[in-house]
């Protein structure tokens, strides 16, 4: 069970991230829905052997590896992300995330609100509702 200011990640709604990779699990931990309007801290579980394909965008990614073993490749350079490591992927750089371990790769990824489709949509609706003086 989650409160307004505390909770278990496993109790947070799972959001559809199937476009990223087969079997990936995504939960938005901190975002506009619970008070962080400018950024979104997302909890991902990337299954063994899966990858989020190469892509680029203008915003940075900030990653913290929680469990398992992943790598991030930035413009062809490979950076190891075993449990407890972190990485920053600069905006504008082509990058890919891979699970290279023997189980799930679990990590936190922080991006600006406009860098997450669920957070962006929620924020737009909340802003519109605020203008109309109604609940989102």
Question: Each PLM stretch: what is its role?
Answer:
Residues 52-54, 72-73, 89, 95-101:
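Short beta-strand His + acidic residue motifs that chelate non-heme Fe in jelly-roll/DSBH
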Residues 1-38, 121-136:
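A short, N-terminal "cap"/entry segment at the start of jelly-roll beta-barrel domains
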Residues 43-47, 56-72, 110:
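Short, conserved beta-strand element in jelly-roll/cupin
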Residues 35, 91-117:
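Ligand-binding loop in jelly-roll beta-barrel domains
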Residues 48, 58, 77, 93-94, ...:
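A generic "binding-loop/recognition-motif" signal
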Residues 77-91:
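Short acidic-glycine-tyrosine-enriched beta hairpin
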